[in-house]
């Protein structure tokens, strides 16, 4: 049986930390779906389609990685895709409490669902999408925090939004 895992998130925008978790999960699972959440409650900087496009560009050379958007419950999305594993990243103890609650909620909705937690590598432990967004908004250098092949695209999308296009 081939194993399929889902790595869900808002990815607003994707960071090197996210990409590292995707690559490391590929060592464990045959196929990984990077599931981009609509997440209107977080009021993302980039639209769902833009975040999907950024992730597709960031993962274009990774075999057996698929990028899809979703706007349903994660437990339902996993069931629809036939996945039994959810991948999550934990940067700090504060992440663990939140992720534990979400993991239990998902398991209550889909008892076959397991959540696997990855710690970031030391070089990526401080990176978050909110830190990257703040740096972008203040015209700081951010390209070392995001996948190299997506940095220019992320910046062009940001400037397009800033101009109101």
From Swiss-Prot:
Catalytic reactions of this protein: (R)-4'-phosphopantetheine + ATP + H(+) = 3'-dephospho-CoA + diphosphate
KW Nucleotidyltransferase (keyword) present: yes
Residue numbers binding ATP: 10-11, 18, 89-91, 99, 124-130
Keyword Cytoplasm in record: yes
Gene Ontology BP, a term: coenzyme A biosynthetic process
Subcellular location: Cytoplasm
Record: residues binding substrate: 10, 42, 74, 88
GO CC annotation, single: cytoplasm
Disulfide bonds: none
Molecular function GO labels: ATP binding; pantetheine-phosphate adenylyltransferase activity
Signal sequence range: none
UniProt-annotated site: Transition state stabilizer, residues: 18
CDD domains: PPAT (cd02163)
Pathway terms, separated by semicolons: Cofactor biosynthesis; coenzyme A biosynthesis; CoA from (R)-pantothenate: step 4/5
TM segment ranges: none
Keywords assigned by UniProt, alphabetized: ATP-binding, Coenzyme A biosynthesis, Cytoplasm, Magnesium, Nucleotide-binding, Nucleotidyltransferase, Transferase
Principal subcellular localization: cytoplasm
Pfam families: CTP_transf_like
EC number: 2.7.7.3
Complex formation: Homohexamer.
Protein family according to the UniProt entry: Belongs to the bacterial CoaD family.
Function: Reversibly transfers an adenylyl group from ATP to 4'-phosphopantetheine, yielding dephospho-CoA (dPCoA) and pyrophosphate.
Name of the protein in question: Phosphopantetheine adenylyltransferase
The species this protein was found in: Helicobacter hepaticus (strain ATCC 51449 / 3B1)
Lineage, opening ranks: Bacteria, Pseudomonadati, Campylobacterota, Epsilonproteobacteria, Campylobacterales
Name of the gene encoding the protein in the UniProt record: coaD
């Amino acid at each position: 049986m081939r194993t399929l895992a889902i790595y869900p998130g808002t990815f607003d925008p994707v960071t090197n930390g996210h990409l590292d978790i995707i690559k490391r999960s590929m060592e464990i699972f045959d196929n990984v779906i990077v599931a981009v959440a609509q997440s209107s409650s977080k009021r993302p900087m980039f639209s769902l389609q833009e975040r999907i496009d950024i992730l597709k560009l960031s993962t274009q050379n990774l075999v057996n990685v698929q990028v899809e958007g979703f706007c349903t419950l994660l437990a339902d999305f996993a069931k629809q895709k036939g996945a039994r594993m959810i991948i999550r990243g934990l940067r700090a103890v504060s992440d663990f409490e939140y992720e534990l609650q979400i993991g239990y909620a998902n398991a209550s909705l889909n008892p076959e669902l397991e959540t696997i937690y990855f710690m970031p590598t030391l070089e990526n432990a401080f990176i978050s999408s909110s830190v990257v967004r703040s740096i972008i908004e203040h015209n700081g250098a951010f390209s070392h925090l995001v996948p190299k092949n997506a940095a220019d695209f992320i910046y062009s999308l940001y400037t397009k939004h800033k101009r109101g296009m």
